[in-house]
């Protein structure tokens, strides 16, 4: 699995800026107001062939006993427990503060490796900036600049050196590898028990650490499956809800290692933002998805209609996924769930012939042309498959940058229906034919127009008249000579 790096530090030391640098995005809000990043934010990064996950935590206020800052501190401690490495960020301009010392004391108690990074070090003397932070006893400080990127590469390179090279992904397996994901207490443990059997689960519960993730191979109705069982989703005991509700690292890691994700929802609870967040991770990773709405047997008909309305409203972006209304405790609906897992896997791994893809594209264009963007109408010529898990269709043509999102959705639905792509995301990429004269500098230079003055034009005209007169005189002379002879 990808190593997870947690960014920890007091408010306004530049964690969100460093997060943006490491993930090459601007997903985390960046502002000078201390404490702006309220909850943990997650992103993907890669150095060479080594991918990683980054957690952008809220500002660490360990001395506060109540209020939102206290909740942010608890989330940070949870992030430290779940991460594989911790980057402790301090402010090189402000210098060492008492709060930095308190945070360092907490981090020294953690079994995770801690890397001390002195941020905002651009333009300064590195030795001078780092000197006072040796007092924290966290090793040699890295002087970096999250805003400008100075020293960031060496920091991440040193962190990733301690982790092995990534092995071939389990997602490339020749059979469904699925992970059961979802919020706490929605019935993931009960579903895992229903799938594997109580004794098998208890045996695996006895081994491993809180960071272990177990791959269990099994067969159902003669078909092979592998379930990714993340530690801590079964019998964790009572966990602080304020911390646990933001814990999605295990879900992210499980999704990365699987080729199908099974999202479990609780029919007895309202659809929460965290449900949509976890579903979004699976969608962003391009994984096939099956949704299991658990505890369906314990609610009234009126509540069932309400749940369906909430799903349509809050999980509208999962229109490609198959929803199953099950009871894991009574093992109802499990067979249909496995049928959808197999179908979603088949759709994610489908191989589509190029001629058929192009025919479907041309048929879609005949039914509905892409709308104009100003004076330009996009022209799509042909398409082919560009990848699997998820399926990718690459469309070639001209002016494809002008294709609207609504038309892309139209093409997506058309391809999905033509190839029966149920349960998997489908991505469409536009490959625009290059225009060699796109840049003004590359255009062939036109010869400048010659501006001829009026006097020059008159002289040329007079010269032509004189030449005509001379020609006429010569003609008359030659005619006279002929007659004289």
UniProtKB/Swiss-Prot annotation:
InterPro entries: AAA+_ATPase, G_ENGA, GTP-bd, GTPase_Der, KH_dom-like, KH_dom-like_a/b, P-loop_NTPase, Small_GTP-bd. Residues 470-485 have a biased composition (Basic residues). Keywords: GTP-binding, Nucleotide-binding, Repeat, Ribosome biogenesis. Pfam families: KH_dom-like, MMR_HSR1. Transmembrane segments: none annotated. It comes from the Bacteria. Residues 457-469 have a biased composition (Basic and acidic residues). The keyword Iron does not apply. Residues 3-167, 176-349 form the EngA-type G domain. One of its GO terms (biological process) is ribosome biogenesis. Residues 435-485 are annotated as: Disordered. Belongs to the TRAFAC class TrmE-Era-EngA-EngB-Septin-like GTPase superfamily. EngA (Der) GTPase family. NCBIfam families: GTPase_EngA (TIGR03594), small_GTP (TIGR00231). Associates with the 50S ribosomal subunit. GTPase that plays an essential role in the late steps of ribosome biogenesis. This is GTPase Der. The lineage of its organism: Bacteria, Pseudomonadati, Pseudomonadota, Betaproteobacteria, Neisseriales. The gene is der.
């Amino acid at each position: 699995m990808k190593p997870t790096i947690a960014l920890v530090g007091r408010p306004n030391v530049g964690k969100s800026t460093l997060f943006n640098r490491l993930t090459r995005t601007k997903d985390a809000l960046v502002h000078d107001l201390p404490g702006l990043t309220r909850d943990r934010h997650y992103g993907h990064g890669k150095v060479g062939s080594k991918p990683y996950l980054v957690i952008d935590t809220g500002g660490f206020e360990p001395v506060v006993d109540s209020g939102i800052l206290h909740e942010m501190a608890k989330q940070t401690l949870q992030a430290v427990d779940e991460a594989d490495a911790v980057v402790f960020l301090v402010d090189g301009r402000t210098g060492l503060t008492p709060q930095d010392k308190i945070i360092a004391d907490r981090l020294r108690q953690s079994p995770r490796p801690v890397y001390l990074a002195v941020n905002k070090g651009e333009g300064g003397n590195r030795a001078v900036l780092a000197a006072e932070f040796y007092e924290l006893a966290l090793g040699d400080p890295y002087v970096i600049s999250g805003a400008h990127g100075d020293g960031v590469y060496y920091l991440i390179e040193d962190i990733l050196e301690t982790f092995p090279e990534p092995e071939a992904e389990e997602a490339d397996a020749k059979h469904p590898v699925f992970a059961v994901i979802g919020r706490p207490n929605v019935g993931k443990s009960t579903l895992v028990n229903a799938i594997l059997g109580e004794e098998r689960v208890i045996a695996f519960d006895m081994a491993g650490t809180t960071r272990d993730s177990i791959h269990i191979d099994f067969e159902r109705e003669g078909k092979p499956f592998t379930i990714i069982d993340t530690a801590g989703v079964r019998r964790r005991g009572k966990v602080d809800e304020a911390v646990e509700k933001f814990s999605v690292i295990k879900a992210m890691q499980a999704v990365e290692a699987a080729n199908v994700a099974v999202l479990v929802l609780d029919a007895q609870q309202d659809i929460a933002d965290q449900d949509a967040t976890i579903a979004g991770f699976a969608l962003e990773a391009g994984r096939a998805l099956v949704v299991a709405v658990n505890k369906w047997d314990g609610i009234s008909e009126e509540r069932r209609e309400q749940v369906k309305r909430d799903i349509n409203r809050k999980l509208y972006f999962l229109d490609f996924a198959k929803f199953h209304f099950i009871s894991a405790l009574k093992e109802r609906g499990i067979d249909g769930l496995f049928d959808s897992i197999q179908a979603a896997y088949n759709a994610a791994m489908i191989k589509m012939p190029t001629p058929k893809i192009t025919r479907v594209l041309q048929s879609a264009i005949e039914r509905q042309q892409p709308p104009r963007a100003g004076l330009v109408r996009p022209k799509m010529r042909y398409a082919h498959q560009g990848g699997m898990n998820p399926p990718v269709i690459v469309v070639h043509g001209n002016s494809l940058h002008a294709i609207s999102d609504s038309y892309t959705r139209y093409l997506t639905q058309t391809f999905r229906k033509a190839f029966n792509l149920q349960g998997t995301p489908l991505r469409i990429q536009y490959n625009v034919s290059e225009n060699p004269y796109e840049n003004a500098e590359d255009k062939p230079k036109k010869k400048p127009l010659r501006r001829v003055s009026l006097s020059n034009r008159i002289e040329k005209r007079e010269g032509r008249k004189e030449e005509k007169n001379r020609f006429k005189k010569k003609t008359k002379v030659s005619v006279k000579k002929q007659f004289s002879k």
